[in-house]
Design a protein with these regions (language model features):
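Conserved PLP cofactor-binding pocket of PLP-dependent enzymes
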Residues: 75
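Short glycine-biased active-site loop of nucleotidyltransferases that positions the nucleotide triphosphate
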Residues: 38-41, 83-88
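N-terminal accessory segments
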Residues: 1-39, 67-70
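A glycine- and small-aliphatic-rich helix-loop capping segment at beta-alpha/alpha-beta transitions
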Residues: 86-100
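Short helix/loop capping segments that flank catalytic or ligand/cofactor-binding pockets
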Residues: 59, 82-83
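N-terminal glycine-rich flavin-associated loop
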Residues: 16, 41-72, 96-121
Length: 121
């Protein structure tokens, strides 16, 4: 990602904070370190991390990113082993960590409905 794209994302931070809340938009270098990798050996440097709490917030972030041609990488718990949650092109990491509720467990039909930040610990 070029410098102009990086600056464009930085300009969007106030709008991202309006969408997700001040505490749920990370752009400090120390905060971003955790989001440079998952369980694989690959690394990438996001410009900003957004931690939405609702599907509406996700939709708003994606619309904003799309209208500004900014790459977005979705991240569940960051435990993947294939590098799928790595921001190789910079951009925005959309962390689903706050969306960690088990919504339904149907034992008879053997399925569960969970949010993307649920971990199996």
């Amino acid at each position: 990602m070029g410098k102009s794209q990086h600056l464009k994302i930085k300009d969007l931070i106030p709008e991202l904070k309006r969408i997700a809340g001040d505490n749920y938009v990370l752009d400090d270098q120390a905060d971003l370190l955790v989001y440079e990798y998952d369980g694989s050996i690959d690394r990438g440097n996001p410009v900003v991390v957004v931690l939405p709490n609702t599907t509406k917030e996700i939709s708003q972030v994606l619309k904003l990113a799309r209208s500004n041609s900014i790459p977005v990488v979705a991240r569940g718990a960051g435990t993947g082993l294939s590098g799928g949650a790595i921001a190789e092109q910079g951009g925005i990491v959309l962390s689903m960590a706050r969306m960690n509720q088990i919504l339904e467990v149907n034992r008879s039909d053997r399925y569960a409905i969970v949010e993307p930040g649920v971990v199996n610990l």
